[in-house]
Structure formats: structure tokens, C-alpha cells
Amino acid sequence: MQNMSLSHLAYELKDPEVLRSPIVFASPHSGREYSKEFLQSSVLDARVIRSSEDAYVDQLIDFIPEMGAPLLLAKVPRAYVDLNRAADELDPSLINDVHSRAQNPRITSGLGVIPRVVSNARAIYRGKLSKPEALARIDQYWFPYHRALRCELLRFNCRPDLR
């Protein structure tokens, strides 16, 4: 296997030259590519929005492919869409036409799949988002990231020598 890097809007996948480990390293909160539109739609400045990042964790673990394991890095910031949440963790306090199904402390605190707040409970937006906008973010970022993660995990099923 050659050393490859697959890039998508939502993630970057770094493969090792030689696959030696059955572990997939995934970093769903390493994204820091903030669109101008997102920054303009927020009531917060870029520095405050970035307080929700796991800043530079991707650089801390960038050596993983050299150790023989794949590395999946988020490119989208978690303040825009949180890849470490379920796709249906939609916050009715943030997204129009969404109704609460059950009590979920993450959603209640503003940390659903589309976060309403960053650290110290600071609101990201002035008002609510439309449901189509929220679902478009999930389609564009959440699903591709999780498909890539699932594909990497399935790859190990074909390699009994790595189980």
C-alpha cells in the first residue's frame, strides 16, 4: 500500500505506507477550516468560536500513519457540525421545525450535532437555523466523515492478519 492522503470537504484520510495496525485513529474535533459565511453568520468573533476546538490535535497525532495505522482527521470545525454526535441530535432551540424526542443532556446544553453554543455557553447565532440548512450540513460533512470511518473499519474485516 502506498502512503496516501484522501481529502474531502469534511475530512482528510491519511493511510500508512504499510498497514500494520487494526486501529483506526479518528479525530472528529480537529477541524479548523472556517468558512467566511459561517464566521459572518455568528455573533462571536473567530477567536471565541475557535474556543470549541481541540486545537492542533491533528498535529499532535500526525505521526500515526508512520506507525502503520490510518488517521482520519476532521476538517470541518465542530462549532459548525459536530462529527462526534449522532446525526439526529438536532437542537429544537436552534433549528426550526425540530421537535424534541427525548431528554438528551448534550442537546439541552446546546451541544447537538449542529452546536448552538461554544465554551462557556456562548451562543454562536443570533437566531435559529432552518431545518434544510442544518440537514445540508449533516449531508455535506457528517455523513461523508462517517462513511470514511466505516470504510476504514470494514477494511480490517478483510485482513485476518490484523485482527
Identify the residue ranges that each predicted region occupies.
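N-terminal catalytic or cofactor-binding beta/alpha core of small enzyme domains
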Residues: 1-163
